[in-house]
Amino acid sequence: LPLKEYVMPNCTFHIVDAFTAVPFTGNPCAVVTDADGIDPSDMLRIARETNAPETAFVLASDKADVRVRYFMPRGEIPFAGHPTIATGHLLRELGVLKPGTARFEFAIGVLPVDIRPDRVIMTQPPAVPDTCADAGTTAQALGLQASDLREGLPCQLMRGGVSFLMVPVRELAALRRINMDRPALKAVLAPLGVSAAYVFAPEGVAPETDVHARLIDPDNAGEDPFTGSAAGCMASY
């Protein structure tokens, strides 16, 4: 194929591991700190090149302290949790944001982000309960039995800035047994208009935790190591 001249602005990006204190663990995010002037089509190209679960692009805002756009390799998304934590942490480390409450402009609106010396806390829009999925079909698509699900709690869509299907299971062992049937899970999720199921148990791996969860996504890598926006939907559920 003939080569054609292609020029785009230079940019700086950092790889930030969110939800961890140990490098190369947690959930990685690429953060481009000087994204003003980058065309959205180039943002998508950069996201595909970094191949991180999400790539954040920091821009100037006339409504907030910063504006942020998030891209997965497949396209732009309106909001996400771990990129917000990663971006807030990096901007604090670079001295762009000082400790206190910062205002981030997202595609879904302006939200507060609490910048602290030792952590970053995001606020997301409340999620509201919506359509329920058939419990037996959902369990089967995840490689589980209907008896693995928590009795009396529905497999339910929680609709918010980003929406997910909530799937409550009885115990941690059920989470470990998940063996997704991709086509079957896609068939469960497609009518709900979401791409992932958030499966959670009422016990944690560590003694100081109360819940353990897995984000099962048949369209991408299969599983996201930590999904902040889904955790917020679970809290609303």
Residue ranges with predicted function:
Residues 3-79, 85-237:
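Active-site proximal loop and beta-alpha junction motif in alpha/beta enzyme cores
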